[in-house]
Swiss-Prot record:
Native organism: Homo sapiens (Human)
Modified residues annotated as Phosphotyrosine in this record: 127
Function statement: Cytoplasmic adapter regulating receptors of the signaling lymphocytic activation molecule (SLAM) family such as CD84, SLAMF1, LY9 and CD244. In SLAM signaling seems to cooperate with SH2D1A/SAP. Plays a role in regulation of effector functions of natural killer (NK) cells by controlling signal transduction through CD244/2B4 without effecting its tyrosine phosphorylation; downstream signaling involves PLCG1 and ERK activation. Activation of SLAMF7-mediated NK cell function does not effect receptor tyrosine phosphorylation but distal signaling.
GO cellular component term of the entry, any: cytosol
Tagged with keyword Transport: no
Protein name, per record: SH2 domain-containing protein 1B
The gene coding this protein: SH2D1B
Limits of the SH2 domain: 5-101
Length: 132
């Protein structure tokens, strides 16, 4: 995913630290859900609390966001369009999205894969698996 505010497998705790560091309402980022595989979390800060909105992948690649109860179901063709919608006030979130918190390094998902590969390559074992 090529969005600068997508942080991959960022933990909830690390997410809260990043968003609350500046103490500004409307800071936001996207991360993978820790509890539901394949679901994204749009996290936004407001009054020193981080609010999390789940984003589900629908049929045909569309995205659906969970907002305030009673709000109509909202579906978007892309994540960029979804974010754009919620940058406007009064759209069903606690606060509109103001400032994306961009990742400063490759998303954790890819960094984790690289670390796994380095661990495998750098193992000090004399045993070598040979594939048929």
């Amino acid at each position: 995913m090529d969005l600068p505010y997508y942080h991959g497998r960022l933990t909830k705790q690390d997410c809260e630290t990043l968003l609350l560091k500046e103490g500004v309402d409307g800071n936001f980022l996207l991360r993978d859900s820790e509890s539901i595989p394949g679901v994204l979390c749009l996290c936004v800060s407001f009054k020193n609390i981080v609010y999390t909105y789940r984003i589900f992948r629908e049929k045909h690649g569309y995205y659906r966001i969970q907002t305030a109860e009673g709000s109509p179901k909202q579906v978007f063709p892309s994540l960029k369009e979804l974010i754009s919608k919620f940058e406007k006030p009064n759209q069903g979130m606690v606060v509109h999205l103001l400032k994306p918190i961009k990742r400063t390094s490759p998303s954790l998902r890819w960094r984790g894969l690289k670390l796994e590969l380095e661990t495998f390559v750098n193992s000090n074992s004399d045993y070598v698996d040979v594939l048929p």
